[in-house]
Design a protein with these regions (language model features):
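Charge-dense, helix-prone N-terminal extensions
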Residues: 1-113
Length: 113
């Protein structure tokens, strides 16, 4: 599979809508770029140009996504990537895939009851 079709690729606006649809999610800012938090913890960010997002996955979740969709997901550079931080190019992502991965990142950071 190549890049997502023009009709299905995710825009920064759609990404925001998906992230903010999760319970208690808010948009904030970290080092000058948008981030998305739950319970005060960042679960996702957008880069300055809003062309890709970073999801705070576990290393196991990251590995699963890299195996399932290597053309869409890649580890962040350095120690962050080793911890599970995963970059997703919005132009290659589809809403259903991104929704599922965002939910994982949100669950990782959401307050435990």
């Amino acid at each position: 599979m190549g890049a997502a079709s023009e009709e299905s690729k995710v825009t920064a606006r759609q990404f925001r809508k998906l992230a903010l649809s999760l319970p208690d999610a808010i948009e904030s800012e970290h080092m000058g770029h948008p981030d998305f938090r739950v319970g005060g913890k960042i679960f996702a960010t957008l880069n300055f140009e809003e062309t890709f997002c970073v999801l705070m996955l576990t290393p196991e979740q990251q590995n699963d996504w890299l195996n399932r969709a290597p053309q869409r997901f890649k580890p962040c550079k350095g120690a962050w990537g080793l911890r599970g931080c995963t970059q997703v190019e919005l132009t290659t992502a589809t809403a259903p895939t991104l929704r599922q991965a965002l939910k994982m990142a949100w669950t990782n950071k959401a307050p435990k009851e």
